[in-house]
């Protein structure tokens, strides 16, 4: 029976939404693997390295080029909205109010795993197949280091909601640290993506963006909230287009679009509702499209070994940095461990970053696969490590600094 592209596309959508949900719901995985993690894992399982190898005819039928192109369009828009929300949710005002504590903690939480990750990446430079064809060594090393250092702010919010600490003082402290790290990480990414052949365009983009931002902010404060929501999506599309045209990548533009908006322009409950619905309704398509980019050509064992090394570098670096910050700031027993395990959450933001590195051919699809596995492992460790610690030191939940 012949099927058109629309019918095959809908089969793909049926798979994307049903398979991970059924695994999550009936497998009762929520403690170790929230639905978002199950969706990412399912994306990998449905990719060319696993399903494509086991059932090549079915794989090529469902995920043919026309269907993949349609899925990619949805995935691009989904991730742009998600990244914009992450930018809006940066809490830099609170970070400034507690600037000594926030700067020390965020600096060590970022710098230590960045160094550990760069050291691990230096070990990969000498082996063929890990560094992308358009990467210089420093870009590859810094990109891997950045991936090991990043904290996934939006997923961190979801996990802290699950642990019932998001609106508590410790949750707000952790958001301050993560917000500063987010800004720094996107700055590092911009340096990595600097294209000397298009540096004029990139500088032009930054100048025009600065002027446009001033005008945009002047307009937004004069609008009613209902208009702000709609205008924010127009602004998102414009910023993403301009950044991509300049060679920085559309996701950098999406983050900048959100970062220059104030969270108090929008109702917090509506913002939470938007984030939850983007995650439920369209982000699963991004997870699938991410899984379709995985590659096991180096051999499964090599990819898993590299993923394990990067996971160790990431987690140990984050915990070491936070414990050092705790000693400097004289935190109580157990405090650094809880904060460190929460801040090492990778999930979506790291996956978004490594998608950008893959797009720019700074890493290969094998490295991308290893980093994806590292992000999954990192996120699955978070709740099982933090929940028992919170039960033992419940008084920390209410500590403000």
Briefly describe each language-model feature range:
Residues 2-15, 66-83, 134-151, 197-211, ...:
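Structural signature of hydrophobic alpha-helical transmembrane segments
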Residues 3-11, 169-177, 217-228, 271-278, ...:
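Short, amphipathic, aromatic/basic-enriched membrane-interface segments that mark the entry/exit
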Residues 12, 16, 35-44, 101-110, ...:
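Alpha-helical transmembrane segments of multi-pass membrane proteins, especially transporters
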Residues 12, 16-25, 44, 48, ...:
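Transmembrane alpha-helical segments of multi-pass membrane transport proteins and ion-pumping complexes
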Residues 22-30, 52, 92-163, 290-394:
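Transmembrane alpha-helices that form the ion-translocation and gating core
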Residues 31, 45-101, 219-309:
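Membrane-interface junctions of multi-pass transporters
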Residues 39-51, 104-119, 176-189, 229-243, ...:
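Small-residue-rich segments of transmembrane alpha-helices in multi-pass membrane proteins
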Residues 129-141, 156-184, 192, 200:
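Membrane-interface helix-loop-helix junctions at boundaries between adjacent transmembrane segments
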């Amino acid at each position: 029976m012949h099927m058109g592209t629309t019918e095959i596309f809908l089969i793909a959508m049926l798979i994307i939404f049903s398979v991970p949900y059924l695994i999550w719901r009936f497998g009762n995985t929520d403690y170790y693997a929230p639905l978002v993690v199950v969706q990412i894992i399912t994306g990998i399982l449905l990719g060319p390295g696993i399903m494509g190898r086991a059932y090549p005819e079915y794989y090529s039928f469902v995920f043919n080029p026309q269907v993949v192109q349609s899925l990619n369009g949805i995935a691009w828009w989904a991730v742009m909205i998600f990244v914009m929300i992450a930018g809006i949710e940066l809490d830099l005002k609170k970070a400034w109010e507690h600037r000594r504590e926030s700067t020390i903690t965020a600096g060590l939480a970022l710098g230590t795993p960045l160094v550990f990750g760069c050291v691990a990446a230096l070990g990969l430079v000498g082996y063929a197949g890990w560094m992308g064809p358009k990467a210089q060594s420093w870009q590859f090393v810094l990109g891997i280091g950045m991936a090991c250092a990043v904290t996934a702010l939006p997923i961190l919010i979801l996990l802290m909601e699950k642990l019932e600490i998001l609106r508590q003082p410790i949750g707000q402290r952790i958001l301050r640290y993560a917000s500063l790290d987010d800004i720094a990480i996107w700055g590092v990414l911009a340096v990595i993506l600097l294209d000397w052949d298009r540096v004029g365009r990139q500088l032009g983009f930054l100048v025009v963006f600065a002027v446009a931002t001033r005008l945009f902010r002047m307009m937004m404060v004069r609008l009613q909230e209902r208009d702000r929501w709609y205008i924010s999506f127009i602004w998102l599309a414009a910023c993403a287009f301009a950044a991509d045209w300049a060679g920085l990548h559309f996701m950098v533009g999406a983050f900048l679009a959100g970062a220059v908006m104030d969270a108090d322009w929008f109702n917090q409950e509506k913002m939470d509702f938007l984030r939850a619905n983007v995650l439920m309704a369209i982000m699963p398509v991004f997870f699938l499209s991410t899984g379709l980019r995985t590659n096991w050509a180096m051999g499964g064992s090599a990819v898993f070994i590299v993923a394990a090394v990067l996971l160790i570098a990431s987690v140990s670096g984050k915990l070491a940095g936070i414990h050092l910050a705790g000693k400097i700031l004289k935190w109580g027993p157990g405090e650094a461990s809880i904060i460190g395990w929460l801040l090492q959450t990778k999930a979506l933001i790291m996956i978004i970053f490594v998608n950008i590195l893959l797009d720019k051919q700074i890493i290969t699809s094998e490295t991308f696969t290893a980093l994806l596995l590292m992000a999954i492992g990192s996120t699955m460790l978070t709740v099982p490590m933090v929940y028992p610690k919170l039960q033992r030191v419940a008084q920390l939940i209410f500590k403000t600094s």
